[in-house]
A protein has these predicted regions:
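Post-HEXXH active-site segment of zinc metalloproteases
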Residues: 70-101
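Peri-catalytic and regulatory segments of divalent metal-dependent proteins
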Residues: 1-72
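Conserved short-loop catalytic and cofactor-binding motifs
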Residues: 43, 103, 172
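Pan-zinc metallopeptidase signature
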Residues: 132-199
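Generic alpha-helical structural context detector
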Residues: 78-85, 101, 120, 131-135, ...
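Short helix/loop segments within enzyme catalytic domains
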Residues: 2, 8-14, 92-160
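Hydrophobic or amphipathic, alpha-helical segments that drive membrane association/targeting
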Residues: 1-33, 102, 108, 140-141, ...
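Charged, alpha-helix-enriched surfaces in structured cytosolic catalytic cores
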Residues: 49-54, 58, 71, 75, ...
Length: 199
């Protein structure tokens, strides 16, 4: 883990490594949190389900959050979400707080896309980044996932559709902090195809 961590940090020119922790959790995931000094947490499930190239993308993704200063906002979002649950019985206060939380979630979904780019830059392997997103979509098991079908789903999601599709997308994403894996794959593919990844 430390070797992959230092490789990702080197690729992103991270001069001072943050602390890295492994949390016991069977789910695939990681996070970068903290206020004054951010740190990274990777789940044990991530270590079990990913190969080194995919892990480098995850760690690069979290380092991207760190480099962009996202950890402070992530921590604020977590705190405000807890507060919103506690004051939900207050009509006016909860509406205002829920509005702030909704805006932070929308911002966070955009931050996830920029962190995905950092993960791709750290990993230097678009196919590993795609496998990672497929594992996020399918729970880690790629034996039942068709790459072509997944990319078609990403393209279909990206194309959008009519007003009804837009409303469905809005409802699907309203309470999420992360875009759907297919949407993330579409954005990543667009970035790679544009040539910006190569620069």
């Amino acid at each position: 883990v430390h070797r992959v961590f230092t490789e990702a940090a080197t690729a992103l020119d991270v001069s001072e490594l943050p602390e890295l922790y492994v949390q016991y959790d069977r789910a695939l995931g990681g996070m970068c949190v903290g206020m004054a000094r951010a740190f990274i947490v990777i789940t044990s499930g991530t270590l079990e389900l990913l190969d080194d190239d995919e892990l480098r993308c995850v760690i690069g993704h979290e380092l991207g959050h760190l480099l962009s200063g996202h950890a402070v906002y992530r921590t604020m979002l977590d705190i405000l979400t807890r507060w919103a649950r506690r004051v939900s019985w207050l009509p006016v206060g909860s509406v205002v707080l829920l509005g702030v939380v909704a805006a932070l979630r929308e911002w966070w979904r955009k931050a996830e896309l920029s962190a995905d780019r950092a993960g791709l830059l750290a990993g230097q392997d678009p196919s590993a980044a795609l496998r990672l997103l497929m594992k996020l979509a399918g729970g880690g098991d790629l034996s039942e996932v068709d790459v072509t079908a997944f990319l078609e789903q990403a393209a279909e999601y990206d194309r959008g559709g009519d007003l009804r599709d837009s409303v469905i997308k809005l409802r699907m994403n309203a309470f999420r902090t992360h875009p759907l894996p297919a949407a993330r794959a579409a954005e990543m593919r667009r970035w790679v195809d544009s040539g910006a990844y190569q620069r």
